[in-house]
């Protein structure tokens, strides 16, 4: 059995998957915020409960919103302070007496989608998350690509390309990102960025779902906003896809529920790619909230 943990700032979610990659059981508990020992206990107790339930010693994979910094799994995870700066993988491996795999939650999302029955035919899969932030991951032949600093797929921290400024105007404000850099595309393409763009152009403070509801009602202002956002997304993706050249692009996160993104993006991309380039197949993520658990569990299928 394959145990996949999706760990976030509020919850620790465990999914147990069988050899056919089907979910057999899941359970969620609150994430301890201040005590590392309590955090380890919470994870280990879930593993022990799963072992007893299924009568096996399952493999353990963990997806967490952070970046492993060393081989022992020490990670930077601002949203999970109890585990940040701790040798999480090494400590869990010792306590559970088994190999524990650890990766960024966005990489786990991409891996989950790459291992979908319909998508395994594609050698190079790019996962793109358009949610609270912008992130993603790359999977080549069923294995996540991490890079020496574990930052592969941090697409949100690429800066706005020149074509974006041509589209938006050269007086378009370059916003400071939480990472400290200026003009990161996350500030414009995330759910929060989607709302910020609307306020910037129309001086109205609405959240993304409210703007999308107006678009669905045929509101002209919302329509113009969505057109501008999709053009900006296509411009930024043109740079990324020229570098990565994936066979499949899977889009997840809250904005992926807005069908116009997947249905209208494909027609905009070719003008931002090399003439000889083929745009990838574009699909909405298949596995929703279970994607993080799936991808973490499948870290043990990548050998």
Swiss-Prot record:
Species per Swiss-Prot/TrEMBL record: Salmonella typhimurium (strain LT2 / SGSC1412 / ATCC 700720)
GO biological process: N-acetylglucosamine metabolic process; peptidoglycan turnover
Record's catalysed reaction(s): N-acetyl-D-glucosamine + ATP = N-acetyl-D-glucosamine 6-phosphate + ADP + H(+)
Annotated EC: 2.7.1.59
UniProt-annotated binding residues for Zn(2+): 157, 177, 179, 184
Keyword Nucleotide-binding listed: yes
Protein name from the UniProt record: N-acetyl-D-glucosamine kinase
Gene behind the chain: nagK
Role: Catalyzes the phosphorylation of N-acetyl-D-glucosamine (GlcNAc) derived from cell-wall degradation, yielding GlcNAc-6-P.
Lineage top rank: taxon: Bacteria
